[in-house]
Structures are given as C-alpha cells and as structure tokens.
Regions:
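The conserved cystathionine-beta-synthase
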Residues: 1-5, 11-12, 164-169
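Helix-turn-helix/homeodomain-like alpha-helical modules used for DNA recognition
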Residues: 2-5, 21, 51, 58
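Short beta->alpha transition motifs characteristic of CBS
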Residues: 6, 10, 16-33, 139
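Fold-independent oxyanion-binding glycine-rich loops
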Residues: 14, 23-24, 52, 60-61, ...
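Protease-associated
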Residues: 36-96
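Feature captures the catalytic cores and cofactor-binding loops of soluble hydro-lyases/lyases
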Residues: 73-158
Length: 169
C-alpha cells in the first residue's frame, strides 16, 4: 500500500466486497496495541505467524488458529517464568532448554524459538503430547516480538459496516 501511495483498498472474496481496509486502520491498531491478547483476539492462524516470522512449523497444525492467551517474551529464569506464563499463552523465547520446557509445562499453546535455535527431540515430543505448537524463526526475540502482530488477518482490521456501494449500469 505504501509503495503505491494507496490509502484505502477493497477487501473482496469471490468478487464480492467484504470490507474496506485503510492504512490508518492498520497503523491505529499497531500504535494502540497495548493489549497482549490482540493476536488471539484476532484469531490468527499459525501459518500467518510462521510466514510473518519467516519461520518453520516444527510441531502443530499450521491451519489452526491462535484464539486464547497473551503473547509474551520469556526473558527470565524458569522459576520466575512460572509466575507469569498462563495456560494458552504464546511464548517467544530463545535456545534455553529449561525455558522451553517451562513454557510447555505451564500449558502454553505455542512457543516461538528464536535465532534458529535447535529444538531437542525431548521438547518436540513433550510439545506434541501437550498440544503445544512449536515455531522456529531465524529472528531474534526483539524482532520476533515486534513483527508477530503483523501476522493478524486483515479481517481483524477492515471495516465491514456502513459501507456505501454502487454498481455500474
């Protein structure tokens, strides 16, 4: 949109207008994104997260939706992590085995492992058993945390109501 200097675009599905998306709809949402649950509120597909983070889905269903929980960065030791990770959270973390294990044991719905760090077979098996999606990204934790909200579907931003339309004769 920026490159073409377009400020409004129609959102269509099968040649039918679904809504309208403006640059300000997107920027307002990102600038006011103090809500750590916005990714789940938007019902974001895991495949969108994988694409946005230029990552790989290691465990889980890419067509599934992230629908409950907050997004957080695990930047503490596991003892402290236990106090702030809740069931269904999406946890962005690094290569520390203990942090990955803690997030899964605290019933996170998804862990995003940064810097392309390897994920051990034990962590993969436990994640599979517990239904925890595992995504690997080459990005560092700061970049992953910055970009992850860009994976939200446009349907979350677009305006659907009170659209004035017309047809050509």
């Amino acid at each position: 949109m920026k490159d073409e200097r377009v400020v409004t675009v129609p959102v269509v599905n099968r040649k039918r207008l679904e809504g309208v998306l403006t640059v300000s709809d997107i920027t307002d949402s990102f600038m006011e994104a103090y809500d750590s649950e916005i990714l789940s509120t938007a019902h974001t597909r895991y495949c969108n997260i994988v694409d946005t983070l230029e990552g790989k889905l290691l465990i889980g269903d890419e067509k599934a939706y992230y629908t409950k929980g907050k997004v957080l960065v695990a930047a503490a030791n596991p003892d402290l992590m236990e106090s702030y990770i809740s069931k269904h959270d999406l946890v962005i973390l690094g290569n520390r085995y203990e942090s990955q294990l803690c997030a899964i044991e605290m019933e996170a719905d998804c862990i995003v492992v940064c810097e392309g760090a390897p994920v051990s077979l034990t962590i993969r098996k436990l994640a599979q058993e517990r239904g925890c999606t595992v995504i690997s990204t080459p990005f560092d934790t700061f970049t992953a945390a910055r970009f992850i909200n860009q994976s939200m579907p446009i349907s979350y931003f677009m305006k659907r109501d009170h659209l004035i339309t017309f047809e050509e004769d």
